[in-house]
Each structure stands twice: as structure tokens, then as C-alpha cells.
């Protein structure tokens, strides 16, 4: 007999994280989406993986993820409702062997579907797994101050990254590779998925100008914390600019010393000699 899936740590983690994202104002209405790569051994504790509820076609070649299991937020679902009704707002899916569909094993009990950003998520998982086999989570949200910065700050990766590094001491330690930035693209398309996944090969944080941010990591906590750290730096930047602008900041020499102390190396060319 399988255990009750509502007791699974991965369901509890997802519910807690979506609630926090909503509480912080980063996922208004049905904004935002999360995909969580699960190990088969943890899935079979709670589900009979041979019992397919329905098969959902994909307009994307997911063959590189064939057979893999994911916990995915639903399309059009509100993060604020996940804790109270996880079976309606979440789904456990398995990618079909040919990569052209996903099998629903649990959830979406009202007939719902996985997030419309599923292609972008799957492309990002493929990209991250190619450089980090332990990557498990891809998270998209509308972090307020990072979003605002895309209207007022130079949109080059080096300049954007340097500003974030200079706002909070921990930023260089948390994302020494910097942030990636793609052009504005229509969401829910393969084009935005391809652009994001290309950046994901070198970055775990990808800014979608005038829209939001994508983050990736080995756990829910790591991914949430990555976005949270960058957003805090963007908030500090916003406050600093409203107080009259930067008078002094962390210097490049100090950033180098910080990297040496914590065993990280700033992305090549991002610090001045």
C-alpha cells in the first residue's frame, strides 16, 4: 500500500514555497511557476506509476527527459491556493518515452494542465542537468525590484550583475557567475524557452526584462534563496537610488577579497583590474 502523497516532503516543500512567493508579492494572480524533478524512488512511495490518469501532449521535444518525474504547478493556478488545495493546483507528471507528451500520475483534479511555461522549464532542466547533474528545481516569479530594475538600469549582463554584487556583500558568494539576461520575448513559447535555456548553461539566474526572473538550483531552498538574494540586492538598489544615488559601494578589490575568502571566483571580465 502506498503512503498518502499529501504527507510527501516534496508536496509540503512546494506548498510552503508557493505560499511564501505569494506572500512576498512575487506571484500575483496566476503568475509564476515551478517544476521540481523527483527521484523515482520517492515517487513510488506514494503513487502507482503505472496508473496514468491522462496523457497530455507537448509542443516540445522532451526526449532528453524521457521517463523523468516532475512535480509541476498548474496552468492558470494561483500560488495562494496551493496549500489549501494541492491536488487541484499541482500535478505529478512523467515525461513519455518519446518525449512528446507527459503522463499525469496525480493532481490537476479539476481537469487542469501543467504550467504553460512547461517548455521553458524543461529546456532549462535539460541545460542545467548538462552542467550540474544534481539540479532539481526551476522556478519563475515576478520578483518586484528585479523587475523594476529592468526599466531603469542598463540591460547588459555585466552592468546588471555588478550592481547587484555591489548592493549586498553576500551576492558575489551566492551567484559568482552573475545573472543572464534575455531580450523581451512572448511568454509560453518555445522561443523564450530556447533563449532561457541557452543562458542556463552558464547562469542559474536569468532575467526576463519587464516580466520576471528564472532561477535554478539543486533544492527548493537553494533556488528560492538564490532569487531572494538577488531580489534583496535589487530592493537595496531601489532604495539607494531613491535616497539620492550611490555615494560609495563595495569596491572591486573588496569583491576579489570576498571571493578569495569564500572560495568563489567572479565571472571573468566582470571585475575591473
Curated annotation (Swiss-Prot):
Keywords: Cytoplasm, Lyase, Metal-binding, Rhamnose metabolism, Zinc
Superkingdom, taxonomy of origin: Bacteria
Residues binding Zn(2+), per UniProt: 140, 142, 211
Enzyme active site: 117
Pathway entry: Carbohydrate degradation; L-rhamnose degradation; glycerone phosphate from L-rhamnose: step 3/3
Cofactor(s) this protein cannot do without: Zn(2+)
Cellular component terms (Gene Ontology): cytosol
GO MF annotation terms: metal ion binding; rhamnulose-1-phosphate aldolase activity
Classification via InterPro entries: Aldolase_class_II_sugar_metab, Aldolase_II/adducin_N, Aldolase_II/adducin_N_sf, Rhamnulose-1-P_Aldolase
Compartment(s) where it occurs, according to its Swiss-Prot or TrEMBL record: Cytoplasm
E.C. no: 4.1.2.19
Catalytic activity: L-rhamnulose 1-phosphate = (S)-lactaldehyde + dihydroxyacetone phosphate
Alphabetical list of Gene3D superfamilies matching this protein: Class II aldolase/adducin N-terminal domain (3.40.225.10)
Record text on cofactor binding: Binds 1 zinc ion per subunit.
Biological process per Gene Ontology, one example term: rhamnose catabolic process
This protein's record includes keyword Ion transport: no
Family: Belongs to the aldolase class II family. RhaD subfamily.
Role description: Catalyzes the reversible cleavage of L-rhamnulose-1-phosphate to dihydroxyacetone phosphate (DHAP) and L-lactaldehyde.
Protein name: Rhamnulose-1-phosphate aldolase
Chain's gene name: rhaD
Amino acid at each position: 500500500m502506498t503512503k498518502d502523497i499529501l504527507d510527501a516532503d516534496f508536496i509540503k516543500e512546494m506548498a510552503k514555497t508557493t505560499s511564501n512567493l505569494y506572500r512576498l508579492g512575487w506571484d500575483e494572480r496566476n503568475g509564476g511557476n515551478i517544476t521540481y524533478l523527483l527521484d523515482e524512488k520517492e515517487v513510488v512511495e506514494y503513487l502507482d506509476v503505472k496508473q496514468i490518469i491522462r496523457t497530455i501532449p507537448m509542443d516540445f521535444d522532451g526526449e532528453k527527459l524521457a521517463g523523468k518525474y516532475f512535480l509541476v504547478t498548474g496552468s492558470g493556478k494561483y500560488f495562494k491556493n496551493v496549500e489549501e488545495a494541492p491536488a487541484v493546483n499541482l500535478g505529478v507528471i512523467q515525461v513519455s518515452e518519446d518525449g512528446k507528451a507527459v503522463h499525469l500520475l496525480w493532481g490537476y483534479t479539476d481537469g487542469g494542465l501543467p504550467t504553460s511555461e512547461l517548455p521553458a522549464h524543461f529546456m532549462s532542466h535539460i541545460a542545467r542537468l548538462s552542467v550540474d547533474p544534481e539540479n532539481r528545481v526551476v522556478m519563475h516569479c515576478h520578483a518586484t525590484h528585479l523587475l523594476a530594475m529592468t526599466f531603469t538600469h542598463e540591460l547588459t549582463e555585466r552592468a546588471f550583475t555588478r550592481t547587484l554584487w555591489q548592493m549586498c556583500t553576500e551576492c558575489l558568494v551566492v551567484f559568482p557567475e552573475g545573472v543572464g539576461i534575455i531580450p523581451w520575448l512572448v511568454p509560453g513559447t518555445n522561443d523564450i524557452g530556447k533563449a532561457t535555456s541557452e543562458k542556463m548553461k552558464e547562469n542559474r539566474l536569468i532575467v526576463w526584462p519587464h516580466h520576471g526572473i528564472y532561477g535554478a538550483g539543486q533544492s527548493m531552498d537553494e533556488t528560492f534563496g538564490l532569487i531572494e538574494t538577488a531580489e534583496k540586492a535589487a530592493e537595496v538598489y531601489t532604495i539607494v537610488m531613491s535616497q539620492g544615488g550611490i555615494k560609495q559601494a563595495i569596491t572591486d578589490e573588496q569583491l576579489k577579497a570576498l571571493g578569495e575568502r569564500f572560495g568563489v571566483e567572479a565571472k571573468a571580465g566582470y571585475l575591473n583590474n
